[in-house]
Amino acid sequence: MNHSWMICARLVNGWGTGILNAIVPVWATETAEHKSRGQFVAIEFTLNILGVVIAYWLEYGCSFYGNGESSFIWRFPVAFQIPMLICLAAMVLFFPESPRWLVKMGREDEARYILGRLRGDSSHEDKELVEAELQDIIESCQYERSNFRRQTYLDMLFGTRSGKLHTGRRVQLVVWFQIMQEWIGIAGVTIYAPTIFGIAGMSPAKRQWIAGLNNVFYMFSTLICVFTLDRIGRRWTCYWGSVGQGIAMALAGGFSKLGQDARAAGDLSKASSYGNAAVAMVYIFTSVFGATWLTVPWLYPAEIFPLEIRAKGNTWGVVGWSIGNGWLTLLCPIMFQHLGEKTLYIFAACNAITIPMIWALYPETSQRTLEEINLLFASDSIWSWEAEKNLALLKEQGEVPERRNSVLSARRPSSSTDAARGSVARHHHKGSTVEVESKV
């Protein structure tokens, strides 16, 4: 193996993966209907983990070839990815473009056509709903352009030139969401699961296939999120995930310690029982994570940013993931070496910390259109309850205009994004008031 070429290839691979991580969730959220947006992204992660499972077992099987000395062990898994990439490159040509991106580019006729194909336009009522949704997107895009200038990545990070849209706050939320995702323990469990099983007293050979089986359970658990994420919302999904994961991590650490003590005392039967209990807790942790925290930190960045900078905003989420994942990947070996099973207690504590953070700082986005979500961040306060109060106030202040069968009035109780949007624009900013007139 040429190490220099392998490192170079890994850098190129990582660059491409980063692009896909930034684009795919945005594309999914912009093409999906608001009532099933979470479901679409959750399905994406089910397939993502399926790829992880295939990769793990492929490498595990190849490791036995040629007594572990043949170059086939690493050449075949690398080459196996090439047909997948060719298929992806060919299929992308047939994917529909995001209607919201087309509106942003001024290609409204194309956006209308694609939106009709995505939502269905077989009946007169369907066509009216499609047209109303398109008008919501157009007016939201016009509002965003009139209220803040084009932003660079640094502008987004520090919130400059964003006015009432508070893009700096949104960037901080998505970056820390991804860092939290890694610190709740998944980086340690997925990458260093064999080490955790070693703490529980398992042999090296057994650790490998137990870790692979854990990935299989991980994949199937993501299906839970497909059916629950849009029903109970993003916040409650994280709540119950943090509780389940925290308990599982604490018990895994406890059982690992008991197993080590039993083995030191010469009681191999008890050591094996405690070790199996620790493995069960790791399985439970991974399953709960797959059903909850795996998807939400990737979905949230794709939802909360304005259309003008949505792709850039999701890129900041990828930055947060890279920081959290890279940090823990380097730190975990040191933590396990010096702290042993106590590392799992740290992960348990991090799960507990995430609950008040989500409650206080992260407004709910479920069952809201991407255009309406902008109003959640019109409040000058960082607290989520203030954002909800401000949203309700904006809706009360504006009169509901008689629009052409508005999607919002047709699919939810009478509320108008346009009326609220006008109220946002009427907010005083630096002593001036901007009036936005709804065009009926």
Residue ranges and their predicted role:
Residues M1-R117, Q142-V440:
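Alpha-helical transmembrane bundle of multi-pass membrane proteins
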Residues L118-E131, Q142:
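Short intracellular "coupling" helices and adjacent cytoplasmic loop segments at the cytosolic face
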